[in-house]
Swiss-Prot record:
Its main location: nucleus. It is found in: Nucleus. It comes from Salmo salar (Atlantic salmon). It comes from the Eukaryota. This is Homeobox protein Hox-B2. Keywords: Developmental protein, DNA-binding, Homeobox, Nucleus, Transcription, Transcription regulation. Residues 1-60 bind DNA. InterPro entries: HD, HD_metazoa, Homeobox_CS, Homeodomain-like_sf. GO terms for cellular component: nucleus. It holds the Pfam family Homeodomain. Belongs to the Antp homeobox family. Proboscipedia subfamily.
Length: 60
């Protein structure tokens, strides 16, 4: 029973990308803040950043 894939809204993606551009690694307080702001779980934010860094690595 795998976890459901999260469908991020455009707004959420925009904010996450903006944050990523500014900072590739999040400290926990910031993660909590972003999760609350975007109505996501901390886990979702953490995983998004993890995946985004991998994608970033592949692109360079």
């Amino acid at each position: 029973p795998g976890r459901l894939r999260t469908a991020y809204t455009n707004t959420q993606l925009l904010e996450l990308e903006k944050e990523f551009h500014f900072n590739k690694y999040l400290c926990r307080p910031r993660r909590v803040e972003i999760a609350a702001l975007l109505d996501l779980t901390e886990r979702q934010v953490k995983l998004w950043f993890q995946n985004r860094r991998m994608k970033h690595k592949r692109q360079t």
